[in-house]
């Protein structure tokens, strides 16, 4: 009887670990977000128009991986030049708010103060397909005249 209970417990633990591992792989990591931002910087420096087109192409796996994506905006007017949500294109990043949190202004100010160094912005933002904000961090930097970032859920 104890052996049967032990086998059942092991099976349940294996199943639980499999679910936890699968869920962890659905979200990008901090290291992956930072690497994607570095790849985006290289692409922007090589050819800005081609890079922005790639950032806006949801099928481009270099710049769209699970819940990781590149976003950019023009540093002179704050208008989004790259974002997976087409409704945000051309709008001012500084106007972006989640609940009453002035998220866009935080991102803009962090890029402006960090310059070409990589800065971080902590905030709450809904995961894709949800409405409840959860902790997220974005790595942000200035590349030419573009403020760009890649965020990951903590």
Label each PLM-derived region with a short phrase:
Residues 2-154:
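N-terminal membrane-sensor/transducer module of prokaryotic signaling receptors
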């Amino acid at each position: 009887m104890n052996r049967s209970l032990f086998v059942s417990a092991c099976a349940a633990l294996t199943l639980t670990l499999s679910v936890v591992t699968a869920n962890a792989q659905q979200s990008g990591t901090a290291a992956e977000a930072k690497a994607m931002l570095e790849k985006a910087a290289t692409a922007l420096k090589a050819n800005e128009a081609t890079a922005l087109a790639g950032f806006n192409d949801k099928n481009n796996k270099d710049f769209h991986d699970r819940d990781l994506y590149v976003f950019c905006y023009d540093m002179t007017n704050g208008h989004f030049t790259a974002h997976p949500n087409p409704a945000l294109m051309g709008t001012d990043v500084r106007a972006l708010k989640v609940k009453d949190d002035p998220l866009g202004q935080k991102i803009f100010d962090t890029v402006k103060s960090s310059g070409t160094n990589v800065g971080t912005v902590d905030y709450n933002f809904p995961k894709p397909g949800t409405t409840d904000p959860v902790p997220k961090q974005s790595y942000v930097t200035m590349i030419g005249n573009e403020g760009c970032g890649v965020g990951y859920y903590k």
